[in-house]
């Protein structure tokens, strides 16, 4: 038997339909308005900040330590040219955290805005790295064996499995090592082993299994990779 809806029920039904339609319309519009605009890194601004710093903030020019176009000539300071943009930005961010606290870089990184970090990373990523050279002929074979094959008895994997056969690395996750200063690479392995650098559990584990001589040998070999 058909029964007519009361005026109240009809009004309520219409109101619910209207609310449902409005909610649906808002849901459809959300993605367009909810998505925050992605700000693209400005390599030009990064180049200026890298070369000149910002005297007003007491921020020195990166070039004074890391060299023209990111090709450091100081063995203790890393070459940054050609490193992956995302990786570089990640390291600048991590310098502001306890996991990679470093006396010099932590202070500078904290002075940079998020945009400035990205700009510098974008600039360095497109620079051409200059080659290095292995210097110790007596240990180059040991370094080569460790880099290419690891040390099975110590459960040390081949460095090449993550950093590539020629040390070019893998974008974002594993940095370029080819041509890097031996002194810097040894310093980082030592920091991983001793706990001063804690932003990679994988590298900390590997470094703890390497002796000083093994670190020096593989770091010297890596310096000569092209």
Where are the model-predicted features located?
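The canonical Cys-X-X-Cys-His
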Residues: 59-68, 120, 156-165, 218
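N-terminal export/targeting leaders of redox proteins
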Residues: 1-43, 93, 213, 223-226
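The feature marks the first
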Residues: 41-53, 57-97
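Extracytoplasmic/secreted proteins, especially bacterial periplasmic and envelope-associated proteins
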Residues: 45-49, 87-90, 104-107, 119, ...
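Protein kinase-like catalytic domain
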Residues: 50-51, 66, 96, 147, ...
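Axial heme c-ligation environment in periplasmic c-type cytochrome domains
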Residues: 26, 64, 73-81, 95-135, ...
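Electrostatic cytochrome c docking/interface patches
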Residues: 26-58, 126-152
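Sequence context surrounding c-type heme c attachment/ligation sites in exported
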Residues: 47-63, 85, 89, 148-160, ...
């Amino acid at each position: 038997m058909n029964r007519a809806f009361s005026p109240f029920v009809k009004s309520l039904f219409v109101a619910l339909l209207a609310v449902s339609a409005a909610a649906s319309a808002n849901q459809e519009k959300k993605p367009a308005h909810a998505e925050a605009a992605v700000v693209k890194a400005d390599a030009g601004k990064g180049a200026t900040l890298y070369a000149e710093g910002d005297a007003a903030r007491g921020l020195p020019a990166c070039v004074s330590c890391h060299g023209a176009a990111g090709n450091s000539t100081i063995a203790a300071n890393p070459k940054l040219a050609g490193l992956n943009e995302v990786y570089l930005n990640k390291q600048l961010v991590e310098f502001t955290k306890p996991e990679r606290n470093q006396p010099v870089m932590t202070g500078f990184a904290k002075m940079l805005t998020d945009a400035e970090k990205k700009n510098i990373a974008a600039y360095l990523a497109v620079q051409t790295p200059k080659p290095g050279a292995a210097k110790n002929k007596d240990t180059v074979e040991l370094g080569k064996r460790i880099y290419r094959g690891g040390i099975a008895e110590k459960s040390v994997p081949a460095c090449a499995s993550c950093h590539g056969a020629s040390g070019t690395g893998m974008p974002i996750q594993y940095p370029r090592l080819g041509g890097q200063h031996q002194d810097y690479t040894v310093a980082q392995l030592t920091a991983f082993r001793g706990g001063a650098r804690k932003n990679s559990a994988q590298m900390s584990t590997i470094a703890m299994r390497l002796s000083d001589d093994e670190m020096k040998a593989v770091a010297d070999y890596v310096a000569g990779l092209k």
